[in-house]
Amino acid sequence: MNVKPATAKISSHALKQNLEIIKQKAPNSKIIAVVKANAYGHGVVFVASTLEQNVDCFGVARLEEALALRSNGITKPILLLEGFFNEQDLPILAVNNIETVVHNHEQLDALKRANLPSPIKVWLKIDTGMHRLGVALDEVDYFYQELKKLPQIQPHLGFVSHFSRADELESDYTQLQINRFLSVTKDKQGERTIAASGGILFWPKSHLECIRPGIIMYGISPTDTIGKEFGLTPVMNLTSSLIAVRHHKQGDPVGYGGIWTSPRDTKIGVVAMGYGDGYPRDVPEGTPVYLNGRLVPIVGRVSMDMLTVDLGADSQDLVGDEVILWGKELPIETVAKFTGILSYELITKLTPRVITEYVD
């Protein structure tokens, strides 16, 4: 018997392949590769090391993420997409060549007070319609002029904004955001970025000087389609194994609460994967996994360490057989549709108990 527990297999080849497709979409744009949240659950050091020679900058959400990259030998510029949180962190940014977004008056005032060993690169975040972070359109000129005065920052500002509906192709709101962004930056020097994954795929006029690929870099669609439709390949294959195959009689319940009873005699497979590994607990009955060339449905309640699947009465599956929870054979977008949970959330919720294997 050879049983392998929950394992995320991360492919450097797929990662590089996806980056090439992204470059084909926006050949004249620099790439800010978004690796926040442990590179969307894929391993931030591995992803950054794999891509460093082929991107211009990395985007993260927290200073700790940026410092982890620096301590592991990553030398390309790193951008704090939410900006700095504490004034005392500004010298750390300067020493480590970490760039920052500025999106409010508090950050501007902190920069004015800062005593830095060297100037830092600043990107002015502009609220073009997301209404989450960013300075208002009528404040852009003020912030621009104030920032340009400061010896604490490098002379060429960047400009950044974010779409709220890039995946809604029938909406004119994204075009409105593009127009607003172009309008408030047209007479100002500096690189601009507004296109994240949805903008890269669907709004070519938004590509500008820099793009910020996130979820598509990992082979996952930002819409309700699948990445394969855009030529993307899943970077992660999440697998586990059957740890038991049981004969199951018609009418017998399975698992906690007995919420599923079999309508016929069948075989039940027990998979070493549960919510303790980050797989959702409340998945609907029938959510598929991939096993021996076919999809089989989850039945019963997902528990902390295991889930159960209906193999069928005539199945030949054996203990130790590999089960794919999502990946090339079963797109995570399909699992997302069944569960009602975004692919973004599924991919970032895996726990440290899941073994990570990095492959070519």
From Swiss-Prot:
Reaction catalyzed: L-alanine = D-alanine
An annotated GO BP: D-alanine biosynthetic process
SUPFAM superfamilies, per the entry: Alanine racemase C-terminal domain-like, PLP-binding barrel
GO molecular function: alanine racemase activity; pyridoxal phosphate binding
Pfam families given in the database record: Ala_racemase_C, Ala_racemase_N
InterPro entries referenced in this protein's UniProt entry, alphabetically: Ala_racemase (IPR000821), Ala_racemase/Decarboxylase_C (IPR009006), Ala_racemase_C (IPR011079), Ala_racemase_N (IPR001608), Ala_racemase_pyridoxalP-BS (IPR020622), PLP-binding_barrel (IPR029066)
Pathway given in the UniProt record: Amino-acid biosynthesis; D-alanine biosynthesis; D-alanine from L-alanine: step 1/1
Catalytic residues of the enzyme: 36, 256
Record-listed N6-(pyridoxal phosphate)lysine modification sites: 36
Residues binding substrate, per UniProt: 132, 304
Keywords noted in UniProt: Isomerase, Pyridoxal phosphate
GO cellular component, one term: cytosol
EC number: 5.1.1.1
Cofactor(s) named in the record: pyridoxal 5'-phosphate
Gene3D superfamilies recorded: Alanine racemase, Lyase, Ornithine Decarboxylase, Chain A, domain 1
UniProt xrefs under PROSITE patterns: ALANINE_RACEMASE
UniProt record similarity statement: Belongs to the alanine racemase family.
PANTHER family recorded: ALANINE RACEMASE, ALANINE RACEMASE, BIOSYNTHETIC
Job of this protein: Catalyzes the interconversion of L-alanine and D-alanine. May also act on other amino acids.
Protein name: Alanine racemase
Gene this chain is encoded by: alr
